[in-house]
Amino acid sequence: MFTKRREAVASLLGPDACLLVASNNHVSRNIHHTYSFRQDSYFWYLSGFNESDSIVLIKTDKTGSLSSYLFVPPKDEHSELWDGYRAGPQGAQNDYGFDHGFNNFDADKTIPGLLAGANKVFSLIGYKEDFSQRVSSWVKEARLKDRHTAAIEHLDAGPLLSSLRRVKSDSEIEIMRKGCEISAQAHKSAMQFVAPDMNEQSLEAYYLYKFAEHGSRFPAYTPIVA
């Protein structure tokens, strides 16, 4: 499914083009803990990869043929002991179907070379300011590497990706239906559970529990319990 999505994106990019999309990153809650991680929807759409600090790069050559790259957190026994399994660059290829996998710390030295020679570079301009600045710096460096890249266009990928995401496959529609069923049941259960003198925190905890009970890690939207 994700490979087909990358192929669909490549067909819209045209020849000699690149697309860059970043994952979400962990957000610190305090010095030793982070908030629950939820992957960026655009990044997930193209990769199915649920780790932070990662980058998808899709590149087309002069014929429009696709090459896919995934920059991921490196394998680290100590970190994996505490935070869970990491796929690593090899897993990006073997488990997620990317043509090439790299450690994320190689992005700054690798990506400008991949962009060199492209006519167009697409990214979600202004969506994540820090990443947008990194992409701009990579484009500038790519221009210095290849005189043919001097006229490179840096374009917003939002309209392109949104046009694909609006059209749902049968499997996506089924997931949405399942999500609606879980949401409806959670609301019904919360209404049956509520009682006089119950505080909002208890009701919210029960409501979120019902999502987890039926197989959903998160609700579709953060609930307002008042």
Tell where the protein language model's regions lie, with residue ranges:
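A composition/biophysics-driven feature that prefers long, compositionally simple stretches
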Residues: 1-186
